[in-house]
């Protein structure tokens, strides 16, 4: 049986470029455990240039093959692609649109679902439409005096707020604000990352995460895990990835009742199905001291670094990551043929 030529595409050039490379390491190691795949790892930079791990400049063509700048190298036909790209252009849905155009099968959520989840404003509209509780918010479409006034009013009403660039991941462009004098500066910074900004009420709560993925035709939601941050901090980019991070992750959240756990899992599956996600996601919730459950955000291509929760929760649920990838890829290619 011939091997599947699998393109492992990583990087992307966004603020999460280096994290994407770390995740790609995990995918590459997992795929190497199967004899089904011939894997070519290619990094995409912020200028849209492709380069193999061996340093060869190349491009993905409309004919679904990798062509090398060195024309003496034989083009490499691509059967399947894993876009291991956090942020733009992967989680934004842009690169999936291109794959659809050239009819190249790919791993992960499709273009529209990716875009809807990546934009925090659009995502919250979907959460509300699906009847899933989420945090109170306002959104802003330009940086001006009116935006500053609206944000200061929200701060006065809620006591503490988060100002977030609407289309960034890994807490990029995300700021906790308790002082009205800082509103203008924070808004200016947030608008530097995205054309839209969302302002949310700060919720004092536990941060719980659920891995939701497709396995043998079923949508699976794991028991919630938990992010435990250092005192008076939130889960910033540095807290997520710095070697000296004081944040802790528990694959299984402690002291969560079976009833609450099941409700969180039910909301997660409802969001996955309702927003037509595919293959994988990590869905994050807040759990308040009063046991109020609030959907925070959905990550359509969760990190797979050594400290990332998605692969740990999948494994804890009893599923092997390599087998999971094989099932998804083979099922998709069989359906296509």
Swiss-Prot record:
Q: Name one GO cellular component term.
A: cytosol
Q: Where does ATP bind?
A: 154-209
Entry's EC annotation: 6.3.2.4
Q: Where in the cell is it found?
A: Cytoplasm
- Tell me the enzyme class: ligase
- Name one process (GO BP) from the record: cell wall organization
The cofactor note from the UniProt entry for this protein is: Binds 2 magnesium or manganese ions per subunit.
Q: Which reaction does it catalyse?
A: 2 D-alanine + ATP = D-alanyl-D-alanine + ADP + phosphate + H(+)
Keywords from UniProt, A to Z, are: ATP-binding, Cell shape, Cell wall biogenesis/degradation, Cytoplasm, Ligase, Magnesium, Manganese, Metal-binding, Nucleotide-binding, Peptidoglycan synthesis
Q: In which pathway does it act?
A: Cell wall biogenesis; peptidoglycan biosynthesis
Transmembrane intervals: none
UniProt superkingdom: Bacteria
> Which amino acid positions bind Mg(2+) 2, per UniProt?
297, 299
Q: Does the entry feature the keyword Manganese, yes or no?
A: yes
Record: residues binding Mg(2+) 1: 284, 297
InterPro entries given for it? ATP-grasp, ATP_grasp_subdomain_1, D-Ala_lig_Van_CS, D_ala_D_ala, Dala_Dala_lig_C, Dala_Dala_lig_N, PreATP-grasp_dom_sf
* Pfam entry (one): Dala_Dala_lig_N
A GO molecular function assigned to this protein is: ATP binding
Q: Which cofactor does it need?
A: Mg(2+); Mn(2+)
Task: Report domain ATP-grasp positions.
Answer: 124-330
Q: Sum up the protein's function in the record's words.
A: Cell wall formation.
- Annotated protein name in UniProt: D-alanine--D-alanine ligase
By which gene is this protein encoded? Answer: ddl
